[in-house]
Amino acid sequence: MDLMDGTQFEDFVADLCRRDGCTEVRRVGRTGDDGADVRGRLPDGRTMVIQCKRYNPKRKISNGEVRNLLGSQVHFKAEVAVFVTTTYFSGPAERCAVQNGVVAVHRDHLGLWNNGAALPSLTAVNGAGQGDRRHRSLRRNTYE
C-alpha cells in the first residue's frame, strides 16, 4: 500500500468494498471531488462515501480532514461515511470520527481489512486499535 499512488490506493479501497459485497462501487476521486474518493452501497443497502488518504505513516489525519468528510457525507446524502488511510488519526480527529459516526479505518485496521476482515466488521472496532502506550511508542520510534 505504501508504494501505491493516490489513484491506485483509491482503486484498492474500491476493490476491497466490492470483495465485501458492496454494490454500485465507483472510484470518483480527483481534484474537486467534493471529498469523495469512492462511493457506493454497503451490503445492507445503505449509501456510503469514502475518503481515502495515502499518507506517509509519520503524518496523522487531522480533525479538519474528518470534518471535511462529514461535509461530503451531507453533500452526497450518504448514510455512512468512511475514512480510510495508510496512517493514523490524531486524537482530536479520532474523537471527531467516533462522535459523528465516521468509520475511521487507520493503518492497522486497513491491514485487517486487506487480510479478509469485512468492512462492516470494522465498525465494531471504530475508535480503537491505535494501540496502547507501548505500541504507540514503538510506532513513533519506527516512523518518526
Per-region residue spans from a language model:
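Mixed-charge (Asp/Glu-Lys/Arg
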Residues: 1-34, 39-144
